[in-house]
Amino acid sequence: MYCSLYEMYEEQESGVAQGAAEIGAAQHGDEIGDFRCFSCVCRNVEHLLEAYPPDKSARKAVMADVARLYAEGGVDMAHADFQRSAYGIVAKHFPRILPFWEHKRAMNDRALEAYSLLKSHRPPSVSAFKYGLRTALAGAGIDFERSSVAEILHGVDSLATAKLAIDHSELLQKKLGEAKVVLYLANRAGEIVFDRFFIKSLSGVEVGYVVNCPYAGYAASGQDADYVDMRSVAKVVANGCEAPSSIPVRLSARAWESFLKADVIVAKGAMNLASFYTLHDPRLFVLMRVPCQAIGSVLGCAAGEYVVVNPEARRQELSRTVTPRNA
């Protein structure tokens, strides 16, 4: 069945609807993002349009509708919801045209070729857990569309022993050691291969891997999960959000149940951070390359830096560095 991005999400399960309402009420003004997010979403939409047939009038109409959406209320929307709506506009103007899989398959193929060489690249001083974690983290910053296999491996090698701007890896390892159920939120195609590499290093835990809608651009979907054999190491769950990231208030019943059961939540990428940041959930760890200063200013680091961050722990760290005005 065609999965229309622009249809409004409707959840029939009363328990999920109630939980979503509670989450919405819990979001009280500390969302990540500002006016700069508009230009970021526009760039993402322009990138999506490159995969579609070269229809100049349709592309102009898409960008006009995105600008109108922002002017008519998008400025007050959460960043993830605005991006979801913008992707929906693309789907509306190009109904039933699904151009992404060939591009994503090529991204996965490059990652898989690099994956076959990863074990021989692991430094002797780096544990299997740390190397798996750093490989997954490197995946968040690699351009799998354009990078060669050599460049991909160089990205992993460079990060294997590098100092991170924020490094809560030890806390993550401790929490994983205590956990029975882990929820892992996917980001993009290609990157999913390195997620699998990290998940394989985890033992004694049940892992749920949450994927995105197959029509949401280059986001990792169930199709990608099947292609890279993710189901052999994790239980794959569709998030139901019709977006390039997971959004708490739009999770499917199954994804919501997985969210509630998880002892630890590992999220990839800035969009998942933005979506879950307002929940103040101590279970959440985010692996990403900081994409912009709007994100960096919240975490207290610069754009372009890599982080393994527990947002709640980071809040506490930053609060301790603030000097009272009257001190």
Model regions and ranges:
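Short amphipathic alpha-helical segments and helix-helix/interface helices
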Residues: 173, 196-200, 255-256
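Histidine-anchored nucleotide/phosphate-binding helix
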Residues: 185, 189-209
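Structural motif
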Residues: 181-183, 263-264
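Hydrophobic anchor at the start of a short beta-strand
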Residues: 182, 206-207, 284-285
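C-terminal functional extensions of proteins
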Residues: 3, 211, 217, 223-327
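Electropositive, gly/pro-rich neighborhoods at or near active sites that engage anionic ligands
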Residues: 2-179
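Short, basic, glycine/proline-bearing loop/turn elements
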Residues: 156-158, 182-185, 235-244
